[in-house]
Design a protein with these regions (language model features):
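Catalytic core of DAGKc-family lipid kinases
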Residues: 19-23, 27-161
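Helix N-cap/beta->alpha junction signal
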Residues: 5-6, 103
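Hydrophobic structural packing positions in well-ordered secondary structure
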Residues: 7-10, 28, 110, 163, ...
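Short Gly/Thr/Asp-enriched flexible loops that form oxyanion-binding sites at enzyme active sites
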Residues: 1, 9-22
Length: 254
């Protein structure tokens, strides 16, 4: 299967092949192309990408990569992946793969705003959404139960504007939110903000994100996890709609 497009099209391809073992070729011509960028695939170079795919088919070669799988817990439900509306009155369960990141907070709000922006596709649209959303951040309430990389289990509340479960390093056309993520390590990276940052911290975080040094900021927390449950905490604001790979996913708990 060959997916031609941006992050959303790659997400469709990833869900089509799932864990079937079928190879997925990517011709990255979208606005973000974060998954392709993370794999060092050609970006916005159609002929080069097609030649690479044909060569891989002829040689019978491929690389194995991890995907995240998000499923709903009781009371969690899916929404339409294209516009964020409820799928049906029956509240369908969430059951989908994602290649890049599951966005649960500020990152999801930024993605939603970028999706509805009238600016041209690309990094400018996402950067503008970042600036707008940073001006009215909320501290959302999450309760997490995570199996960490060493097999231990951690359970706690996180009251934070941002919570991301990352499989890849980049989001939004090159912003490196999770610099330690690797595509074939069997792990996900949980990244969050420890508190609502002030203006100076926001400027510092944005600058660091565009230069691959985000987790050097004291405002961020980070854990490597094998799996995680995310529910609504009793404190904090209501989290926004979850998004993954630029597509709408659904509502907590997952």
């Amino acid at each position: 299967l060959v997916a031609v497009g941006g992050v959303g099209m790659v997400a469709l391809g990833a869900n089509a092949v799932g864990c079937s073992g079928k190879p997925l070729g990517i011709v990255a011509i979208g606005s973000g192309n974060d998954f392709a960028r993370g794999l060092d695939l050609p970006v916005n170079r159609v002929e080069t990408a097609v030649e690479g795919i044909v060569g891989a088919i002829v040689r019978g070669t491929h690389i194995d990569v991890d995907m995240g799988l998000v499923t709903s817990l009781p009371d969690g439900h899916a929404i339409d992946s294209t516009d964020g509306t409820d799928v049906s009155q029956s509240r369908s369960p969430i059951d989908r793969y994602y290649a890049g990141m599951l966005s649960c907070g500020l990152d999801a709000s930024i993605n939603d705003r970028a999706n509805h922006s009238h600016l041209p596709n690309g990094s400018l649209r996402y950067f503008a959404a970042v600036i707008v959303e940073l001006t009215h951040m909320k501290s959302c309430g999450y309760h997490i139960k995570a199996t960490l990389a060493d097999g231990s289990v951690e359970e706690r509340d996180i009251i934070s504007p941002l919570l991301t479960v990352a499989n890849s390093r980049h989001i939004g056309g090159g912003i490196e939110v999770s610099p330690y993520s690797r595509f074939a390590d069997g792990l996900l990276d949980l990244v969050w903000l420890d508190h609502v940052p002030n203006f100076r911290e926001c400027v510092d975080a944005v600058a660091r994100a565009y230069h691959g040094r985000l987790l050097g900021s004291h405002a961020f927390g980070w854990k490597r996890v094998r799996d995680i449950e995310i529910t609504r905490a009793t404190e904090g604001d209501e989290p926004p709609v979850l998004m993954a790979d630029g597509e709408y996913v659904g509502h907590l708990p997952v």
